[in-house]
């Protein structure tokens, strides 16, 4: 008998603009898209903390060349490299990478989507791989991807969000958020709400 678990199966992913703090660059974008500064307009720690108080997320920094981005990941973090940060908590994984590239956010996220679909398709216990058409603009673009994992006669609907944001003219922040329903629990929904606020992704159950 096959049992299908429906936790977070009907999450709707809508595009909205998030905010990250970028240092070490001279980028003058609209503040609703990116809050950047070059040392002349410092954002105080107190001000930053007052705007970003999370239960499950902690601050981290990714660096590449002269670009540095401060962002939030689950508190149980795993440092991969200076330009990357990765963390998993309550069945939700966030993987960030700061890339120096001439490619657009749409190109980067689309390429990553194809790679991920190819990997998933090669695994026997993964089925029903479906992605949306993507949404965004020249500065930020994202795709959502859903699939089912079968384990011991139970089907676990899972999903990924692939997001890319141009944080300076030369650098793009690539973010992959994975929800693995084999490991989600009663805390997962609250964690996803915080991720929604921190990354500018509207997640609706």
Positions of predicted regions on the chain:
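Bacterial N-terminal signal peptides that target proteins for export
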Residues: 2-12
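N-terminal targeting sequences that direct proteins away from the cytosol to non-cytosolic compartments
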Residues: 25-84, 179-205
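Conserved polar/disulfide-associated segments of primarily extracytoplasmic proteins
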Residues: 80-171
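Short, well-ordered beta-strand elements
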Residues: 169-181
């Amino acid at each position: 008998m096959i049992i299908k678990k429906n936790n977070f199966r009907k999450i709707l992913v809508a595009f909205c603009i998030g905010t990250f703090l970028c240092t070490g660059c001279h980028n003058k974008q609209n503040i609703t898209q990116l809050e950047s500064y070059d040392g002349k307009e410092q954002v105080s720690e107190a001000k930053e903390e007052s705007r970003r108080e999370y239960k499950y997320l902690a601050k981290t920094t990714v660096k590449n060349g002269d670009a540095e981005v401060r962002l939030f990941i689950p508190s149980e973090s795993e440092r991969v490299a200076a330009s990357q940060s990765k963390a998993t908590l309550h069945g939700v994984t966030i993987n960030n990478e700061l890339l120096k590239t001439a490619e657009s956010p749409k190109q980067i996220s689309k390429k990553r989507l194809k790679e991920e679909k190819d990997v998933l398709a090669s695994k026997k216990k993964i089925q029903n791989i479906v992605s949306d058409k993507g949404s965004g603009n020249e500065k930020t673009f994202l795709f959502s991807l859903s699939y089912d994992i079968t384990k011991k006669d139970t089907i676990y609907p899972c999903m990924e969000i692939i997001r890319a944001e141009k944080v300076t003219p030369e650098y793009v922040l690539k973010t992959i958020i994975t929800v693995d329903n084999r490991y989600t629990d009663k805390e997962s929904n609250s964690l996803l709400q915080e991720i929604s606020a921190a990354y500018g992704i509207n997640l609706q159950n």
